[in-house]
């Protein structure tokens, strides 16, 4: 039998010996976020405030988006609206956990984003998933109007909400995080 002596390799890093669970930045780490795409305008198309109102509300907004698309880089994010609230109500009544509600509620804003993509297809409307976010510079160079769900991608891993099951992080939070 061979006897091997294994030495633990050490990688020099400011975070190597830091605890990352206490919050804040470890000493000596400066944090200054880089604005990845500062010229992009993120617009939320609300589920209840716009999509649920149908053609009379949606079409004038899309006309404005099309008129602005050549002047600005626009990323559209969609809310869920009444249908998402209905899903939350049923799933809560069935006593499903918060993560399941987040996953189920995320389907509705995705449906809304797909509808907008179809309506904007002739103008470069393009449905994208959260994982396509890194491709935004390419889509903008091609003259596209990227459209995505406003729901953050936590899904089943959404933290339980104090005093209820409705996910705290819904489309308003997702659009904010996207814009950040």
Show where each model-derived region lies.
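Glycine/small-residue-rich interface belts in oligomeric ring/scaffold proteins
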Residues: 72-73, 77-80, 84
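Ligand-binding beta-strand-loop-alpha-helix segment within the catalytic cores
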Residues: 88-170, 178
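Charged helix-capping and loop-helix junction motifs
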Residues: 56-61, 168-174
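Short secondary-structure transition/capping motifs
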Residues: 50, 54, 76, 101-109
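N-terminal glycine-/serine-/threonine-rich phosphate-binding loop
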Residues: 1-75
